[in-house]
Amino acid sequence: MDLSTLVKMSNTYGSNPAYVLAGGGNTSVKDDTTLYVKGSGTQLATIKSEEFVEMSRARLNEIMKTDYPEDDVKRESLYLADVMAAVTDADKTKRPSVEALLHNLFAYTYVLHVHPTLVNGLTCGKGAKELSEQLLGKEVLWIDICKPGYTLARICYEKMNAYKEEFGKDVQVLLLQNHGIFVAANTVEEIGVLFDGVISKLEKQVKRTADVSDAVTSEKEQAAAVSYTHLRAHETSLHL
């Protein structure tokens, strides 16, 4: 599978400090049999094709059919082992993103997951779920805060199935409380349209932003300060 488009998308969004608050984020591309997902420990801004991890979609699908123990420690240990067993990459030292299973659940070719300051100003805010529906509509799926790993994937699996029954289509935009945004589509161009649409709607709710031009000296410091002050401004300036 050609990963050049995935690499370009990853580098583009990963290079914008307004989209990757505190680093992090991940991306993927898939066909009917194989998922390529960002490797753990890599950076979106600089990731190369060889740093994505190849995984079997059939094995990932089997995880959703597995009956794991109720005990958190035992469940997550077995779940992690099954995720690693789904890795088909020739380089067995690679570890997939912790959200690989969630990427596999989306019924679209490309998936983008980032932590934009504007989005996190919403998802980390007071009354966020209600505000999300008010500003973005019901077709943006909201997921309440929960444990990462299998628990998150299971909840998303159930919510995504319920969404399809209600709307007659698959989820393309998903918000995680206190976390970030997932956007899925069959083309990178459509991901851009969906992502920009969310950002545009949130920008209209911002009453003011901070001026940090005199408070920083280096480029690195300025990027960090802009990310932080934008988040603080958005947390207090959105109509909560």
Placement of each model-derived feature along the sequence:
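N-terminal low-complexity or amphipathic/hydrophobic leaders
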Residues: 3-80, 105-106
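Short HxH-centered metal-ligating active-site micro-motif
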Residues: 61-117, 163-166
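Flexible, glycine/proline-enriched loop segments at strand-loop-helix junctions
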Residues: 85-92, 138-150, 181-185
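Active-site glycine-rich loop that binds ribose-phosphate moieties when present
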Residues: 94-98, 144-168
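Histidine-centered catalytic micro-motifs
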Residues: 109-126, 177-180
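Contiguous mid-protein beta-loop-alpha structural module that forms a pocket-lining wall or clamp
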Residues: 157, 161-212
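Conserved small/polar residues in nucleotide/adenosyl-binding loops
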Residues: 229-236
